[in-house]
Amino acid sequence: MEFLPNQANQRSKSKKLPLRLILVVPFVLQIFAAVGLTGYLSLRNGQRAVNELATRLSGEVSSRINQHLDNYLKTARHLAQINGDAIDLGLLETQDQQKMAHYFWKQMRLYDIGYISFGTLTNEFTGAGYYLDPNKIVVSYASPKKQGNRDFYAYETDSYGNRTKLFDIFKNYQFEKEPWYAQTTKAGKSIWSSVYQWEITPFPLAVSANRPVYDKNNNLIGVIGIDQRLTQIRDFLRQVKVSLSGKSFILESNGLLIASSSQEEPFKIIEGKPKRLLATDSSDKLIQSTAKYLQHNFGNFNKIKDAQNLEFRENGERQFVQVTPWRDEWGLDWLVVVVVPESDFMAQINANTRTTIMLCFGALVLA
């Protein structure tokens, strides 16, 4: 079959692409590539910024908590040493319980502590501090020699520290079984007690800085104990803002909670008695998942010897963690943990990324 010249010419023209299309398509593809690359780089840089910000924030919060622990717990050690030295030098007479209690009362007014105790080998006890009311200082005594029993008598005080009315009696007070006394006499040196709970509601957790006291012949006289209630540490953690939903908590190397920034107490009441709480059993999901991650990652909490910056995923979301050991010369060995969810920062990053992409698309439309 033969084609007429003009028919072939028309077919040839139909195969050619329009010049406008040839010019526009590469340009559009370049803009799409630029938009995609810009969005990717924006998101990537945003995530890098989140990493840096989360690390810096958790580091700053950890530093503040460590500094608070240094100052707060150093006070108890310092005071235990001062009182022990005063007894050694004969400046504080252990036989005059009322005078000793008044001296302790004055120290309570000066220092941020919970309770001051002195127990002797002959079961005499003298103390001053916060008892049932966290805002009122009481003085307390137990003296089998004078009273004929081991009952603990607690008195309210006036504004000068003089005892006023008797308001509580704790029957058969055996302080020698409590950690602050028993562990110190066994160690024979200045130590922190293990964390223990007072037997009165609301069952506050406490840790005590203790110093044994000896006579000139190196015979044990008794033990000076300075209680620090862990509620004061808890209150500090709640005041320190981590992030929108970030948390901070402190635990022992055995996994038991010391305090946290959540509203949860570090113990549960079971059949009327307090039972301390493992961080892995916390009702706060972020604290629980972080503690479980640390336990799984290290095998045991006591294997964490240095500060660590870590991250894990919970429900598909990254969680940034900083864990820092805190120790002192009297034997405390705690872990300070700060956890920051990625979502606390990504909302603004994602908004910025969306804005960048929209601007690029706007430029595409105008082009």
Model-derived features with residue positions:
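Extracytoplasmic/periplasmic sensory segments of membrane signal-transduction proteins
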Residues: 74-189, 237-240
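A short, aliphatic-rich beta-strand micro-motif
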Residues: 207-211
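Intrinsic low-complexity, intrinsically disordered coil/linker regions enriched in small/polar
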Residues: 134-135, 160-165, 172-177, 187-191, ...
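Short, hydrophobic beta-strand elements of compact beta-sandwich sensory domains
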Residues: 222-229, 321-348
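Membrane-interface helix-start motif
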Residues: 17, 233-238, 341-363
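Juxtamembrane membrane-water interface segments immediately C-terminal to a transmembrane helix
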Residues: 41-78, 84, 91-98, 347, ...
